[in-house]
UniProtKB/Swiss-Prot annotation:
Signal peptide: none annotated. ADP binds at G214, G238, F343. The keyword Cell inner membrane does not apply. It is found in: Cytoplasm, Cytosol; Mitochondrion matrix. The modification Phosphotyrosine is found at Y76, Y196. CDP binds at G214, D219, G238, G338, V340, F343. (2R)-3-phosphoglycerate binds at V23, D24, F25, N26, Q38, R39, S62, H63, G65, R66, L122, R123, H170, R171. The lineage of its organism: Eukaryota, Metazoa, Chordata, Craniata, Vertebrata. This is Phosphoglycerate kinase 1. Its EC number is 2.7.11.1, 2.7.2.3. It comes from Bos taurus. Its main location: cytoplasm. Pfam families: PGK.
């Protein structure tokens, strides 16, 4: 899945035109303060390019959180983003209190030249995702005629459409696939993301190592299976390693994560690895806890000793870190998706931090290192390594689906060239 046959912003004529742009401003917030502005910064090049190329206006639309189709301005308003964007662009940003309807259409019909307008959260309308919940929390589906009206209103806000929301590219939502304008182009962030993943997956440097962490095997089956066709080596860490170790080594895992559904496929995945000559590295030792708590009592365990009843593994131990470091040292290209421990808690962060240090070291010797978004991107922000690896993806789910070999609807919907 690459952008090679899709229209991109650098080939789109925006002079004198109103540009309606889908961006991903779904940023983490605490008490209405933005805690990480990576996604806002990532959209700035596309916005600036439009303004510098003489666009009449740039109308920005995004979601934030999961309001499920119910307006929740106190909790999920994009207003703080408008303030942040103003300081990043160094120019005024007009914030509108809705994203569709006559008032919004009027404000966007003939704005002053060079205007930047940010619409309120798309997901305050159930028609964006097509489904949501009502005020009492019951599931509701959007009516087809209302979805059509919602999409028609968004389509009136610009003359050309740009999609720079890689983080939502795996969702067939109204703002991603339903804006009906003659020219639909991918923005610079979309282009950068897809180029990185296309090169990584279609013509990788070798040896190619995948580091896969996270909790559930079942969620990652497609990922593991697809990557086994592409890589030379794979580290399987994090919570899902326990399912592998219990099945393969009959290891006692205490109350560590065990994925019943995923456990049935472990042997198939291992025989595929064997057939493809992929070297698999699993953890050999662990930092354990007597409960799932930041301040739990901690202990140590190995695969051989097992984890005692009532205890759980929440991080890998020093011997595992050594094995991981050896695999990283052999690699010329690394794709990393999912942490190898509960990195949010200091007592269980050491394994992921040690691995991050090795990946940074590998990058400095010329290895191509790609961090799939989500939790692993959060690790980069936490340890300040965003500019010490080759690429940190802004899309967790979207990068995961690319690595699984899927077509992204948001990219599919762009104009072909």
């Amino acid at each position: 899945m690459s952008l090679s046959n899709k229209l991109t912003l650098d080939k789109l004529d925006v002079k004198g035109k109103r540009v309606v742009m889908r961006v991903d401003f779904n940023v983490p917030m605490k008490n209405n303060q933005i805690t990480n502005n990576q996604r806002i910064k990532a959209a700035v090049p596309s916005i600036k390019y439009c303004l510098d190329s003489g666009a009449k206006s740039v109308v920005l639309m995004s979601h934030l959180g999961r309001p499920d189709g119910v307006p929740m301005p106190d909790k999920y308003s994009l207003q703080p983003v408008a303030v942040e964007l103003k300081s990043l662009l160094g120019k005024d940003v007009l914030f509108l209190k809705d994203c569709v309807g006559p008032e919004v259409e009027k404000a966007c019909a003939d704005p002053a030249a060079g205007s930047v307008i940010l619409l309120e959260n798309l997901r305050f309308h159930v028609e964006e995702e097509g489904k949501g919940k009502d005020a009492s929390g019951n599931k509701v589906k959007a009516e087809p005629t209302k979805i059509e009206a919602f999409r028609a209103s968004l389509s009136k806000l610009g003359d050309v459409y740009v999609n720079d929301a890689f983080g939502t590219a795996h969702r067939a939502h109204s703002s991603m696939v339903g804006v009906n304008l003659p020219k639909k182009a991918g923005g610079f962030l979309m282009k950068k993301e897809l180029n990185y993943f296309a090169k990584a997956l279609e013509s990788p440097e070798r040896p190619f190592l995948a580091i896969l962490g996270g909790a559930k095997v079942a969620d990652k089956i497609q990922l593991i299976s697809n990557m086994l066709d592409k890589v030379n080596e794979m580290i399987i860490g994090g919570g899902m390693a326990f399912t592998f170790l219990k099945v393969l080594n009959n290891m006692e895992i205490g109350t560590s994560l065990f994925d019943e559904e995923g456990s049935k496929i472990v042997k198939d995945l291992m025989s595929k690895a064997d057939k493809n000559g992929v070297k698999i590295t699993l953890p050999v030792d662990f930092v354990t806890a007597d409960k799932f708590d930041e301040n739990a009592k901690t202990g140590q365990a190995t695969v051989a000793s097992g984890i005692p009843a009532g205890w759980m593994g929440l991080d890998c131990g020093p011997e595992s870190s050594k094995k991981y470091a050896e695999a990283v040292a052999r690699a010329k290209q690394i794709v990393w998706n999912g942490p190898v421990g509960v990195f949010e808690w200091e007592a269980f962060a050491r394994g992921t931090k040690a691995l991050m240090d090795e990946v940074v070291k590998a990058t400095s010797r010329g290895c191509i290192t790609i961090i799939g978004g989500g939790d692993t991107a959060t690790c980069c922000a936490k340890w300040n390594t965003e500019d010490k690896v080759s690429h940190v993806s802004t899309g967790g789910g979207a990068s995961l689906e690319l690595l699984e070999g899927k077509v992204l609807p948001g990219v599919d919907a762009l104009s072909s060239v």
